[in-house]
């Protein structure tokens, strides 16, 4: 295995054509982003549409010190825009209307479709008009519990079109967890599908939503309208399974509406709601160490800049590339790097519904070959699971289109890194091992494909505008080599602004331990070459397959059993799922 000193240089062909083609160029741009953030991000902001111009005197203000007053971050304050306009109308005006926005690849290889930017805009406007017809307006919260289908992207962007705040919940969460999140954000509308196949497993999404809405009603909150996509009848069921599930979808009169009954006849024109840069865009729940989920709140202008810029540089995206992120849209990776970041760059992406193992264990590599994918972004858990199979499952496919391989969710172990680099990338691809969180909105520590010499397992260096610091237990900064708490001393545009309806908890969780710093809850160490290595959580959180769960959350479930009076949960390493 490589030692900590082992360095892999970017392939000459990757570096030669990269947006950032040397480490010296990275360092120069990074320094500019720290010394002159207004100038650095202001130049990037010019690529986007602002209905109200940007006031450069109020471009960027913040306070990270609880001793000096309330914690806040503001970027481009006073400027107005609409993200769906920037992702769709702007790209169409720039000549990309007929470009493929998404290749949709279903759970079964016989199911696939595609959607252009022009068609995506039409469908977004249709559904936005339907939402408006049901009284959904600017600032209202909309809960989304959807599989990886095109309507999920349409629903997200329809919310942003009219200024509604979307709250996605991964369609694997229980009705209990979902209802807790619906009640917390007081969602007026819910969007789901009748059901979905994941591999050979059937998930009755609408039934789970019904249970969740019942629980909400018992707790005094009624969801006013539930839109249901009829998905099952248009897809191929796993062989040997009869797909008559759609007949069983229960619909409640006056509340539940089939998508196909209202969307096709709606108008394809919907004027965008111009939002303040600091208006809420979406909220996404993440586990809290006390057990109650935290509604992480992201806002409009800064998030747009950061999603767009990290996507462009970290994946070195070029106009004719095909990009594929395997993450579910229910997680932050799906928000930033399946929906917002790619579309902000007029990218063509693959949207994949299934698992890595269906119908065979080489499905990922078959999809890469089918669409000639250039950038592939997945989790170490998936890589470790796929490593267990024979190499021929990878080598039988033509993966020569690949240029950048990404990793997300947890630090990648060196064994998995080497397998990914050698077997999947043929020692020609750059690996970007990205560290970030739901709270950060986008990558904060990452190599850049053409610029950063790679160390297997290292998160490497900060992205533009990000200033990492290592602190010891007493809050003293660790210079040079050393290990400590990973904190950040200033905000970047894509950072969370608050926890929904709970700013006190926001300040306590992230800013009280070390006044003046955003505390990630992770530890890290800096090696002799200045590379940062994330060492894992330093709070009461478990990292399971790249997803955070609190020990308190698991303990509370265990103690619900009448045979359990006390429960304590500790992490245990797992060869595939991590620790």
Region roles according to the model:
Residues 157, 161-261, 379-380:
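Structural core segment of the AMP-binding/adenylate-forming
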Residues 302-322, 332-375, 388-392:
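Conserved AMP-binding/adenylation subdomain of ANL enzymes
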């Amino acid at each position: 295995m490589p030692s900590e000193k082992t360095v892999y240089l970017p392939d000459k062909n990757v570096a030669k054509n990269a947006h950032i083609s040397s480490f010296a160029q990275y360092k120069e741009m990074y320094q500019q982003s720290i010394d002159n953030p207004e100038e650095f991000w202001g130049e990037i902001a010019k690529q986007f549409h602002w209905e109200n111009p940007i006031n450069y005197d109020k471009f960027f203000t913040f306070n990270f010190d609880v001793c000096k007053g309330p914690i806040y971050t503001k970027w481009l304050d006073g400027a107005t825009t609409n993200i769906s306009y920037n992702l769709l109308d702007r790209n169409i005006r720039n000549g990309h209307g007929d470009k493929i926005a998404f290749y949709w690849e279903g759970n079964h290889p016989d199911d696939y479709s595609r959607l252009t930017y022009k068609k995506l805009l039409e469908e977004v406007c249709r559904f936005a008009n339907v939402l408006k017809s049901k009284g959904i307006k600017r600032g209202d919260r909309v809960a989304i519990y959807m599989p990886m289908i095109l309507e999920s992207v349409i629903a997200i962007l329809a919310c942003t079109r009219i200024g509604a705040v979307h709250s996605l919940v991964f369609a694997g969460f229980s009705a209990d967890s979902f209802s807790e999140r619906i009640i917390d954000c007081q969602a007026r509308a819910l969007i789901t599908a009748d059901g979905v196949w994941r591999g050979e497993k059937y998930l009755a999404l609408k039934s789970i939503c019904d249970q969740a809405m019942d629980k909400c009603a018992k707790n005094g909150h009624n969801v006013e309208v539930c839109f249901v996509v009829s998905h099952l009848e248009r897809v191929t069921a796993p062989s040997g399974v009869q797909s008559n599930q759609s007949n069983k979808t229960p619909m409640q009169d006056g509340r539940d509406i089939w998508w196909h009954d209202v969307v096709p006849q709606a108008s394809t024109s919907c004027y965008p709601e111009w939002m303040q840069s600091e208006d809420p865009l979406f909220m996404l729940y993440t586990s809290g160490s006390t057990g109650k989920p935290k509604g992480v709140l992201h806002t409009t202008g800064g998030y747009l800049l950061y999603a767009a810029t990290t996507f462009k540089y970290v994946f070195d995206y070029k106009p004719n590339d095909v990009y594929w992120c395997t993450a579910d849209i229910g997680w932050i990776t799906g928000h930033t790097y399946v929906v917002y970041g790619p579309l902000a760059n007029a990218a063509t992406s693959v949207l994949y519904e299934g698992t890595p193992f269906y119908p065979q264990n080489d499905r990922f590599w078959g999809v890469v070959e089918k669409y000639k994918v250039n950038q592939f972004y997945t989790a170490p858990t998936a890589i470790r699971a796929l490593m267990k199979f024979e190499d021929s499952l990878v080598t039988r496919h033509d993966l020569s289109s690949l240029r950048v391989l990404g990793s997300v969710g947890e630090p990648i172990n060196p064994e998995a890194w080497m397998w990914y680099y050698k077997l999947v990338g043929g020692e020609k691809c750059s690996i970007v091992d990205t560290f970030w969180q739901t709270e950060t909105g986008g990558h904060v520590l990452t190599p850049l494909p053409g610029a950063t010499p790679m160390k297997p397992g290292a998160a490497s260096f900060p992205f533009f505008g990000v200033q990492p610091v290592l602190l010891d237990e007493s809050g003293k900064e660790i210079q040079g080599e050393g290990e400590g708490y990973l904190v950040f001393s200033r905000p970047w545009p894509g950072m969370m602004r608050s926890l929904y309806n709970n700013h006190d908890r926001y300040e306590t969780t992230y800013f009280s331990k070390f006044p003046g710093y955003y505390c990630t809850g992770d530890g890290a160490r800096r090696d002799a070459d200045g590379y940062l290595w994330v060492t894992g959580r330093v709070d009461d959180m478990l990292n399971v397959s790249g997803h955070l769960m609190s020990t308190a959350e698991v303990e509370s479930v265990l103690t619900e059993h009448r045979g359990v009076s006390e429960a304590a949960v500790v992490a245990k390493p797992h060869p595939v799922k991590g620790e």
